[in-house]
Amino acid sequence: MVVFVNKLTLIGKPEELERIYAHVAEFMEEQPGLIRYQLLRSQKEPGTYFNVAEWDSNESFDKALAEPEFRARLKALGTVIKGEPHMSDVVVEGVAR
């Protein structure tokens, strides 16, 4: 498993980001290899969001990103956010007892 973490800095309206993100997420939910995702808004800095997505592999993630439909939906995100993407490995994992 790999985790995609993208720090998003808002340059547009929050409502617009959330609407566009939902449109992109609708497509991603159908992609093989996506385990789960979340869009998080910072309590400390409301103009900062984090997109966190778990994938079964880098290959599944890369395949989804290469889809023309994804590229088309992604263009709109660039009008409302500036991203800092990071593909990450899980090094410690836990659950509450």
Indicate residue ranges for each PLM-predicted region.
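Active-site-flanking beta-strand signature of metal-NTP-handling nucleotidyl enzymes
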Residues: 2-8
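An amphipathic, aromatic/His-enriched active-site/gating alpha helix that lines ligand/cofactor pockets
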Residues: 23-36, 54-88
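Short, surface-exposed ligand-recognition loops at beta-strand->loop->(often short) alpha-helix junctions
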Residues: 9-19
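Short coil/turn motifs at secondary-structure junctions
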Residues: 11-13, 42-44, 56-58
